[in-house]
UniProtKB/Swiss-Prot annotation:
NAD(+) binds at residues 102, 165, 203. It holds the Pfam family Rib_hydrolayse. Glycans are attached at residues 59, 88, 141, 185. It is a lipid-anchor; GPI-anchor. SUPFAM superfamilies: N-(deoxy)ribosyltransferase-like. This is ADP-ribosyl cyclase/cyclic ADP-ribose hydrolase 2. GO terms for molecular function: NAD+ nucleosidase activity, cyclic ADP-ribose generating; transferase activity.
């Protein structure tokens, strides 16, 4: 009995020890941990961007030093204002009519913008590029970065990554001018325009009305749907009414054709894309008919000239 009791106690001790280890290994926060090699990625992106866009007046090392100050702060005590120096050192002009705001279609926006060749989204300006798709935060009760998890808005409002994007969004809006393009996802189940989100809370309020000509909304639907919302419907109507109340000239287009063409590149035979292909075929056939007609006319003229010369 004593042996059995000892084995039971040992088993219980091992079980409790394992449980303690497992609980200790659980992530503290809901978000991804700090991206490995954060500094190297940051500096590499900065160097590439400033070289390609000829921003020779930017000091990437100084920009990193300004950014990394937040890495010494409690992970739930980082404010947008903590990025002020970083923003001031990294900001640069955005070409007029080239700003592209968005919600729920990050990758499509990146593809269409094509590294600032067509349009310039927030992730295409220097202060957005260096942090895009990255995560960072300090450990909660210790120095050093937390590579296991970082807080999201569900954990605390003033987390390092959300505060970064809030600060960047506000500056991006202030620097935008002319025609403002907005790409929304009309297939998003929760609605194309989140009434609480970065665009609604940290971009629209900071647009400079005297610098904005008009706002053009593109409601894009996934190839194959679903078509949850379109212009004048649901949350899109809420956005249109808000812009109207703020005094902005605005328009709305469902499935803006240049973007839709890009979406159809990988779905050329899908029914949603067939009309585009058919239109192109019709244009090709029309061009061929014109060419045939021109050739026939030329032959007729040559025959007529030959006949008149023989006469």
């Amino acid at each position: 009995m004593a042996v059995q009791g000892g084995l039971l106690s040992l088993w219980l001790w091992l079980w409790l020890s394992l449980l303690t280890v497992l609980l200790g290994a659980r992530a503290r926060w809901r978000g991804e941990g700090t991206t490995p090699h954060l500094q190297s990625i940051f500096l590499g992106r900065c160097a590439e961007y400033t070289t390609l866009l000829s921003l020779g007046n930017k000091n990437c090392t100084a920009i990193w030093e300004a950014f990394k100050g937040v890495l010494d702060k409690d992970p739930c005590s980082v404010l947008p204002s903590d990025y002020d120096l970083f923003i001031n050192l990294s900001r640069h002009p955005i070409p007029r009519d080239k700003s592209l705001f968005w919600e729920n279609n990050h990758l499509l926006v990146m593809s269409y913008g094509e590294n600032t060749r067509r349009l310039v989204a927030l992730c295409d300006v220097l202060y957005g590029k260096v942090g895009d798709f990255l995560s960072w935060c300090r450990q909660e009760n210790a120095s050093g970065l937390d590579y296991q998890s970082c807080p999201t808005s569900e954990d605390c409002e003033n987390n390092a990554v959300d505060s970064y994007w809030k600060s960047a969004s506000m500056q991006y809006s202030r620097d935008s001018s002319g025609v403002i393009n907005v790409m929304l996802n009309g297939s998003e189940p929760k609605g194309a325009y989140p009434t609480r989100g970065f665009f609604a809370d940290f971009e629209i309020p900071y647009l400079q009305k005297d610098k904005v000509t008009r706002i053009e909304i593109w409601v894009m639907h996934d190839v194959g749907g679903p078509n949850v919302e379109s212009c004048g419907e649901g949350s899109v109507k809420i956005l249109e009414d808000r812009l109207e109340a703020l005094g902005f000239q605005h328009s709305c287009i469902n499935d803006y054709r240049p973007v839709k063409f890009l979406m159809c590149v990988d779905h050329s035979t899908h029914p949603d894309c067939i009309m585009n292909s058919a239109s192109a075929s019709m244009r090709r056939e029309s061009a061929s008919l014109h060419a045939i007609g021109d050739a026939s006319l030329l032959i007729s003229l040559l025959v007529a000239l030959a006949s008149s010369s023989q006469a």
